């Protein structure tokens, strides 16, 4: 059990037998009336996001989630195989569980896998990851039909928008949460 004062992003709650992760929360103290906590919760299995409000100080049921450091090894059909960094056990995870993170997975990449009662729930990539651009069109300085960006294909096959000065072969820092360009990596 946890109080609303213990809320933090990533905390997993058990509500009506389902697991929900806190995406956002905000303590609100209105001028009139009692304080409350406004939350945005994401269903761990389905990915559905809902808004829920709790009175301040209310106790809620939390779920024990074990986050383990793993390394992504390879793809086997529709499964992604991860190796636990402590006991070297391999965990094949289905494509549905990996979700959108699959477009940023590179062999040998460190990844956290969350487990509940021994069953894998979801994976967490590092926030910033580095990739090599395998293909992008040359950017012309006078070409301003777009907002100064162009599409680029990364070594994983994912496509992101990058500034015009990026060339094929450049190494980039990318935000794994939204696929946003963060900068070039200096060699």
Curated annotation (Swiss-Prot):
Its main location: cytoplasm. It is found in: Cytoplasm. The keyword Zinc-finger does not apply. It holds the Pfam family EFP. Keywords: Cytoplasm, Elongation factor, Protein biosynthesis. It comes from the Bacteria. One of its GO terms (cellular component) is cytoplasm. GO terms for biological process: peptide biosynthetic process. GO terms for molecular function: translation elongation factor activity. SMART domains: EFP (SM01185), Elong-fact-P_C (SM00841). Pathway: Protein biosynthesis; polypeptide chain elongation. The keyword Protein biosynthesis applies. Belongs to the elongation factor P family. Involved in peptide bond synthesis. Stimulates efficient translation and peptide-bond synthesis on native or reconstituted 70S ribosomes in vitro. Probably functions indirectly by altering the affinity of the ribosome for aminoacyl-tRNA, thus increasing their reactivity as acceptors for peptidyl transferase. This is Elongation factor P. It comes from Mycobacterium ulcerans (strain Agy99).
